[in-house]
Amino acid sequence: MNIKIVCVGKLKEKYFKDGIAEYVKRMSRFAKVKIVQVPDEKAPEKLSPAEMEQVKEIEGKRILDKIKDKEYVYVTAIKGKERTSEAFAKELSDLTTYGHSDITFVIGGSLGTSDAVNKRADDLISFGKFTMPHQLMRLVLIEQIYRAFMINSGSPYHK
């Protein structure tokens, strides 16, 4: 299985980098994991709704350029479907059973994802109604992917 995580912006904090690297290392026995960062669009603090959409569109084009047609795509979104860890693990298992070996997860920038990115998604996934920094979301997402692999392998990691 190939897991790709497409994220907007660079990760600067060492503690996030270290945590993500640890989970990527742990997952190497289950999947090849690739993290792709696309540049975030610089924008002033106060934006009009139209300017916000423009920023999301620019970042969205950068995201879509990194996604291939054959990839199954999850986009993280507050309005996405919430799942339990067990249900998510079953979904990943079912995807591979039905021939999806390339799975991509998208984490948008601070304003979210564009309509075009959301339309490209095969599924919108939510980790709750809380707003999180997108840097933290990377770590949360990768831990949940790892947890799914551990659930599917019968490991006691998930209690």
Curated annotation (Swiss-Prot):
Pfam families: SPOUT_MTase (PF02590). Keywords: Cytoplasm, Methyltransferase, rRNA processing, S-adenosyl-L-methionine, Transferase. Its EC number is 2.1.1.177. Its main location: cytoplasm. It catalyses: pseudouridine(1915) in 23S rRNA + S-adenosyl-L-methionine = N(3)-methylpseudouridine(1915) in 23S rRNA + S-adenosyl-L-homocysteine + H(+). S-adenosyl-L-methionine binds at G108. GO terms for molecular function: rRNA (pseudouridine-N3-)-methyltransferase activity. InterPro entries: Alpha/beta_knot_MTases (IPR029028), RlmH-like (IPR003742), tRNA_m1G_MTases_N (IPR029026). The keyword Methyltransferase applies. Homodimer. Belongs to the RNA methyltransferase RlmH family. This is Ribosomal RNA large subunit methyltransferase H. It comes from Lactobacillus johnsonii (strain CNCM I-12250 / La1 / NCC 533). The lineage of its organism: Bacteria, Bacillati, Bacillota, Bacilli, Lactobacillales. The gene is rlmH.
